């Protein structure tokens, strides 16, 4: 390796905030099912603690050995609605507490998989789990929850969409003392993926191995610095520059994943190619788009800039890694991106533009704070719009929205840490209640019939 490449890597880490955002261990709990809920919970705790006992230590050892910051060590598990559904329990909050206790025992930041897959309908376990989400998130610290309400193959379950509007509202009320923090740990998906390493939407799919390591990379600052060097050049050059930069970022993710896999004795799953921002200055996806020539993110041209970025990152990343997966799209969480926060405050970025950007990235309405008096029906309608984009375009889309109790447009909601600060954004004042009240299913699109 040439000296200038070594120096470039050091600069990327030290100055441009290149890091591994997460090493996530996916653990199957299918062998923990039991008719007795208490027995099932003991099995779950035992399996998680056994499998993930060395996860944090190995992550820290890799950090020291390679000098690469690894921000989060996390766990994802089989959707609990499936596991708990075999028990006679009528409330699953105790399962959430078990996950929380296991996460604390092994020292991980978050554990995902308090989840239900209801894109076509409910099982008994799904119904109980979804009802219990607000209490589960209010009574735990590290548990993340997700619900898949639609897919290209099945259409959109509008009964589930309506219920998730109510669940988000109740979760915000129950966690009002932390400005609705529970909602930051709850994602509603269409076309959810089984190998996502990022929270809050991670769960371990039933088609996955017993235990795997998935890696999520992050490098918005590196990409921005690279684009600075091609100022005024045509888009062909910009795309090629992003592609080459993404290759380098993903190579590092591949290395970390393989080393972690060997040290833990667990198969290596995938690298997720998503560019994940943080609230830190110089770690913003919005600033990448602005570097391409936009005065501020949200103006006309933003969606096109995001499309170029997203596609070039994927092309570079696929070349660098044998197995890519997860969401693999740019993340645009408002509260976690300094450039996004500024654009909202300046009036350049609104919910409608973020919805348009969803057509390009994975989680379009992500970490959005809306007024506390936003109705459950309006929240459900926002979910329905996002799900429709995903279902029609055959891609993952999601919503993570926080109707923080007692807030109004222009207020700031403070979450701290990686979750950042969210300006409260206005929602459309006209009602969608009669639309949401219809229920039923929106049928799958005509192009879903592939066989």
Curated annotation (Swiss-Prot):
Organism domain of life: Bacteria
Ranges annotated as spanning the membrane: none
InterPro entries found in the cross-reference section: UPF0210 (IPR007841)
Coiled-coil parts of chain: none
Subunit field text: Homodimer.
Protein family according to the UniProt entry: Belongs to the UPF0210 family.
PANTHER family per the UniProt record, alphabetical: UPF0210 PROTEIN MJ1665, UPF0210 PROTEIN SPR0218
Matching NCBIfam families: PRK05313.1 (NF003700)
Protein name per its UniProtKB record: UPF0210 protein lin0538
């Amino acid at each position: 390796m040439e000296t200038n490449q070594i120096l470039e890597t050091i600069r990327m880490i030290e100055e441009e905030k290149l890091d591994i955002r997460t090493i996530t261990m996916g653990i199957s709990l299918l062998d923990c099912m039991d008719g007795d809920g208490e027995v099932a919970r003991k099995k779950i705790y035992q399996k998680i603690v056994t499998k993930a006992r060395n996860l944090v230590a190995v992550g820290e050892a890799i950090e020291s050995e390679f000098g690469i910051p690894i921000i989060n060590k996390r766990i994802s598990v089989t959707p609990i609605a499936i596991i708990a559904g075999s028990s006679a329990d009528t409330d699953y909050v105790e399962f959430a507490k078990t996950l929380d206790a296991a996460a604390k025992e092994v020292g991980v930041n978050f554990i995902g998989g308090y989840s239900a897959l209801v894109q076509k309908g409910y099982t008994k376990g799904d119904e109980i789990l979804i009802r219990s989400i607000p209490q589960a998130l209010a009574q735990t610290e590290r548990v993340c929850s997700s619900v898949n309400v639609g897919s290209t193959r099945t259409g959109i379950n509008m009964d589930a969409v309506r219920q998730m509007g109510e669940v988000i509202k109740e979760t915000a009320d129950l966690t009002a003392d932390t400005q609705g923090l529970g909602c930051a740990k709850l994602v509603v998906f269409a076309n959810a993926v089984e190998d996502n390493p990022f929270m809050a939407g991670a769960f371990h799919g039933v088609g996955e191995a017993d235990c795997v390591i998935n890696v999520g990379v992050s490098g918005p600052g590196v990409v921005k610095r690279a684009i600075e060097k091609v100022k005024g050049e045509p888009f062909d050059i910009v795309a090629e520059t992003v592609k080459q930069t993404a290759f380098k970022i993903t190579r590092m993710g591949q290395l970390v994943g393989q080393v972690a896999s060997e040290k833990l004795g667990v198969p290596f799953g995938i690298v997720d190619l998503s560019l994940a921002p943080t609230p830190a200055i110089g770690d913003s996806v919005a600033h990448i788009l602005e570097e391409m020539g936009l005065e501020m993110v949200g103006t006309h041209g933003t969606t096109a800039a995001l499309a170029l970025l997203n596609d070039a990152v994927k092309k570079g990343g696929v070349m660098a890694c044998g197995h890519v997966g997860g969401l693999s799209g740019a993340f645009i969480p408002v509260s976690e991106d300094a450039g996004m926060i500024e654009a909202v405050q300046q009036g350049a970025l609104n919910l409608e533009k973020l919805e348009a950007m969803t057509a390009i990235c994975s989680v379009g309405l992500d970490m959005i704070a809306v007024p506390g008096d936003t109705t459950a029906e309006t929240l459900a309608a926002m979910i329905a719009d996002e799900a429709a984009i995903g279902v029609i375009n055959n891609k993952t889309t999601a919503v993570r929205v926080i109707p923080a109790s007692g807030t109004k447009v222009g207020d700031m909601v403070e979450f701290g840490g990686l979750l950042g600060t969210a300006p409260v954004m206005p929602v459309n004042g006209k009602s969608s209640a009669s639309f949401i009240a219809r229920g039923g299913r929106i049928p799958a699109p005509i192009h879903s019939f592939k066989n």
